[in-house]
Amino acid sequence: MHNNILIAGAGIGGLSAALGLARKGMRSIVLEKAPELGEIGAGIQLAPNAYHALDALGIGEVARQTGVHVDKLLWMDGMTDKEIASVPLANRFREFFGNPYAVIHRADFHGLLVEACHKTGLVEVRTNAEVVDYENFPDRVEAILHDGSCINGAVLVGADGLWSNVRQKVIGDGDPRVSGHTTYRSVIPAEDMPEELRWNMSTAWAGEGCHMVHYPLKGGKVFNLVLTSNSGASEPEAGVPVTTDEVFEKFKTMKRRPTSLIHKGNNWKRWVLCDRDPLPNWVDGRVTLLGDAAHPMMQYMAQGASMAIEDAVCLAFELGREMDPVSALKKYNRARFARTARVQTYSRYASDFIYHAKGGAAAMRNELMGGMTPTDFFQWINWLYGKETVEKYK
């Protein structure tokens, strides 16, 4: 029998898929290349659409309890130290969208998924098990691991991230696009955060060709710092240690308040961001893609994790109601492509128009965003944050 669903990758997308499948009564084997489970990075922003999907997976309440519910989304002009716009996230926001906006430590969130999967009794996770290839057969798919061993299943889901091995056979489109944007990350204790910036908000400082983001994590005990510049970098990097001086040099044109944070950070690390153009087909027979393997996106809409969780809910819905797995995967692909492509495209656009604008473009941004009321924002972003998408997958 080949009833197990095989999932390559035990990150947020892969475990969300396993949990969604378990809620439909389906067993899965999650194949993770790392020697142990874990997540790299600090913070994740969870908008209401992520929580709608987490509710469908049965862990919305525990995720709401674990996250930090920030009071506002705040955009500041880092060149003038003046507010561009803000959106309150309290009662009106929650009533409009049906869920909160929160930030959560990536490791804490991953831990919630691991625990939830374990409790189902239907999810097996194997480490040191990198999927490097696969073969489709009429009645099964065979996942081929790095050590040459093979595992058979009804379906293979490539949730193996930006540098997905599974994608290279499903689509074969080579390496991701190097964006030329470099991100620096650090986490600082709350007591080291300047009191004038110790805000319970997700704050973005927009500069010329750069921006800075900070928000609290772990119940406000630490602050996550994420700084991004249009560096023109042409080679991918991930987690390279760098000096504080290097970071300051990239952002020194901004005002004192935002740049004062740079010297509060320590153990700065550097990433060069990559994404891909939207492509409409993620399916090859009994194999499909999910999350960053399917639609990697820039960080500017803070939707990478959210889209992966939505993918998981949709995939479980289609596999749960369709006897033919090949047909189910095609329906999943069709259901998810337009939405994820829109977020990929908007994420690129937001970097130029909102976060890194210069001169007249920055002035236009300030005028347009500053003129929006909270209701204007709610209505504009409802296509993304609203319940309608996940409601289709129930």
From Swiss-Prot:
Activity vs pH: Optimum pH is 7.5.
Gene3D superfamilies hit by this protein: FAD/NAD(P)-binding domain
A Pfam family that the UniProt record links to this protein: FAD_binding_3
A GO biological-process term: catabolic process
Activity regulation as described: Inhibited by manganese, copper, mercury, and iron ions.
Induction: Constitutively expressed. Up-regulated by aromatic substrates, the best one being 3-hydroxybenzoate.
Function recorded in the entry: Catalyzes the NAD- or NADP-dependent conversion of 3-hydroxybenzoate to gentisate. The affinity of the enzyme toward NAD is twice as high as for NADP. The enzyme shows higher specific activities against the intermediates in the degradation of 2,5-xylenol and 3,5-xylenol, 3-hydroxy-4-methylbenzoate and 3-hydroxy-5-methylbenzoate, respectively, than for 3-hydroxybenzoate. It also shows activity against 3-substituted benzoates.
Quaternary data: Homotrimer.
Name the UniProt record assigns to this protein: 3-hydroxybenzoate 6-hydroxylase 1
